Amino acid sequence: MGLTPMMKQYLEVKESCKDCILFFRLGDFYEMFFEDAKVASKELELVLTGRDCGLEERAPMCGIPYHAANTYIGRLVSAGYKIAICEQLEDPSASKGIVKRGIIKIITPGTYTDSSFLEENKNNYIMSLYLDDNMCAMSFADISTGEFNSTHSNFKEAVVLDEISKFAPREIVLEENIKESFIHTIKERFPNISISKIKEENFAYNIDNNLKEQFNNFNENEYETIVKKSANGLLYYIFHTQKNILSNINKIDYYSIVDYLTIDVNSRRNLEITENLREKTKKGSLLWVLDKTNTAMGGRQLRRWIEQPLINKNPIENRLNAVEELLNNISLQEDLKEDLKSIYDIERIVGKVASKSVNAKELISLKCSIGKVPYIKKYLSSFKSDLFLNMEKCIDTLEDIHKLLDKALLDNPSLSVKEGNIIKEGFNEEVDSLREAKSNGKKWIASLEQKEKEETGIKSLKVSYNKVFGYFIEITKANLNLVPEGRYIRKQTLSNAERYITPELKEMEEKILGAEEKLIDIEYKLFTKIRDFIEENIDRMQKTARIISDIDCLCSLATVALENNYIKPNINAKDEILIEEGRHPVVEKVIPKGEFISNDSLIDTKENQLILITGPNMAGKSTYMRQVALITIMAQIGSFVPAKKANISICDKIFTRIGASDDLAAGKSTFMVEMWEVSNILKNATSKSLVLLDEVGRGTSTYDGLSIAWSVIEYICNNKNLRCKTLFATHYHELTKLEDNIEGVKNYSVSVSELENEIVFLRKIIRGGADQSYGIEVAKLAGLPSPVINRAKEILQHIEGDKEENSLNITPSKEYKSKDYIEVSKDTLNTKNNLESEIKHDTLSETNTATIIEDESTKEHLSSNKKQINCKRNGEKSIKKEVAVDSFQINFEHIKKDKIIEEIKNIDILNMTPMEGFNKLYDIINKTKDID
């Protein structure tokens, strides 16, 4: 038994879209078969049935009504699937044999344009990536708005990942032979991104002609070949899926990565630039604070501003001056914002014009939006700042387009462009004539009904219409005896009525329906002409839309500045960040008003190059460091900042190593991830960079961690090619000695008040280092049981009272020196030798464990509880031991660490149950018995 003709056709079509779920049009339904049906039935909760197809077993099948397809398509695309739409390409009633069918569109996560499934304030980007030798090129397009951006650089995985993080594409198009290991890296970091592959020749085929045809501003001599290949590959994929050239993609914008502030993937996450760490939502992010935009276009543009802060002084100051002028003209700003509220999403409406999917109601929205532009232009002429004056000069009021739409379209047209009721009276004579004929015909129908009621005496008689029988006279069965014999022609019998027609009724029906059909056809043709005229002027509307979005962003920044008492920062060229009474923009919004403690900051590349911050857990060190970075980012966006005064040096890059998390799936422990991040910072930071390092070295033993932290500080300060502005928070109080030995290191700490045995964290950053961590007090605040807290205090007092001071003395390091001498007491060496094998055994048998570290205001990591060397000084003569140091020196002056004290301090009480707490206390008590 062979396949049925329909199933043969289905399989032939399916062969061309193996990676898609095929929606196969059969009558009024889209049907899915075989594996597609199984997937769709599961994802869409549809009943899975079967259909005879000529095989031994029935083909699995499920289907959806074609008129409801958008909802189902949206759900599948949101889940990451691609959908191929196969339509009937001819009228089934007129065809002989199997109906001709073909794929008219492929819908993918990166090419989806249904506004009901897109976030209005977020772009839906699709990205292409092309690699060639040691170079890479990337292009990003949003086909719903017409944006198309390209860039290139030397190939580094980190660079590509940073750009992906910045644009957050839904889909990435790659050359099919790209290394699977790199694809795995992308998927590992961005699991929700869909990956699509195309052949190498699709990136290069007819490259210059394709780009010239698509982009009005393309000049083949201005772009590197690798950039052109990336752009061409993306255009190929868009055409392959959309099956036509989209006229709203008419301009290619090349940008250089180094023209914007670089914020790497980890820093974007740690600083919560556009989404918070916990729920991955906008609330609690910098974007959440700054976004008071009134248009969807402005919301998307503000996100781009935040993702790409500027690094050139003039454009930054232009934005700041414009925001200042808005704040000095509040009434004008309010009028401007009021008009912005009436503007719809011009970019996405003209995107629908380009894809021929716009309806008349959306064009009315476009008309209303354009109608506000002359008023906005008038407001702009009242300002004096360069940015507003340039906008006023460049904005196109689009009066010709507004005039056409206002004259041609009804204010409340039909939703469907193929149902008529679109064109305004007076725009087209033929439309007016047909409408009159249609209206007169319906008046005749109404008069016929009244006449028949009077002549027959049947008050319930009515003249009705349906698509099957046309117009008819309906009389209930109770009144059939009143119907004059021979007056009507019986057409249909119902359970409670009879339906009749008359020759004159059918004659009028033909006139009315003919007029309606012709009217709908003419209105549709007129609508397409109007749509074509708008399409010819898409680039004009896009330019105006971009200016409106910029205005909206500036108004948003002014509104936020006014609401939150922000000030205008001064942008300097002195490599100095000076902030007086700075505040964290997000934290101050989520705590009661007035409770946030402001702090000063001074960081430069000379005497205050590395700010070493010590202090207890939960005191606010991480919040303070993030605050400095966010204020810097805000200033480079062109925003006012939360401070009393701010003098901001432009940074080229911001790096953070805050918090800790395991990457166990990739076989990387907390410490490994931490070291990878620190390595990335040291390799890529420059003297213009701002670096935030929090608890470097905490993921390993105290000696190892302290050594690494110390050497990182030396490397940053002593490397003449680096010397970046750095905030360095640590629990290693021994590092405070570096202020005396390394130029540029300055000690700061978080102020703590001790009142009647109670600890109060003042969250104030003060000059000087801290001398203790208050670990037990933090444990108390976290709710560890009172017996555990009290006993821990007793043990700590006993150990500290019994412990003798010990030290490791190291001479100050010198740049480029490769060795140094550590003075170690004999007792220290003996203790080290006695414990060496035990420590080695513990280290080898220890399992990597993960601790998720969040903002210090809620929780901080307590270091590893590996056994440490108990170094006691007993007054014996010191000996010298030569220690080789790899590329930089480690200098210890005093280490006062006891094995048991360290274990107590390192208890992670936030991740312990009360019973685990008691067990840990019992274990510590047993260990103290051996002290004497």
Swiss-Prot record:
State the PROSITE patterns in the record: DNA_MISMATCH_REPAIR_2
Matching entries from InterPro entries are given as: DNA_mismatch_repair_MutS, DNA_mismatch_repair_MutS-lik_N, DNA_mismatch_repair_MutS/MSH, DNA_mismatch_repair_MutS_C, DNA_mismatch_repair_MutS_clamp, DNA_mismatch_repair_MutS_core, DNA_mismatch_repair_MutS_N, DNA_mismatch_repair_MutS_sf
User: A GO biological process this protein is involved in?
Assistant: mismatch repair
Q: Kindly list the cysteine pairs connected by disulfide bridges.
A: none
Q: Name one GO cellular component term.
A: cytosol
Q: Which GO terms describe its molecular function?
A: ATP binding; ATP-dependent DNA damage sensor activity; damaged DNA binding; mismatched DNA binding
Chain segments annotated as transmembrane: none
* Source organism, top-level taxon: Bacteria
Q: Which UniProt keywords apply?
A: ATP-binding, DNA damage, DNA repair, DNA-binding, Nucleotide-binding
Residues given in the record as ATP binding sites: 615-622
Q: Which positions are tagged coiled coil?
A: none
Function text: This protein is involved in the repair of mismatches in DNA. It is possible that it carries out the mismatch recognition step. This protein has a weak ATPase activity.
**Family in the record:** Belongs to the DNA mismatch repair MutS family.
Q: What is this protein called?
A: DNA mismatch repair protein MutS
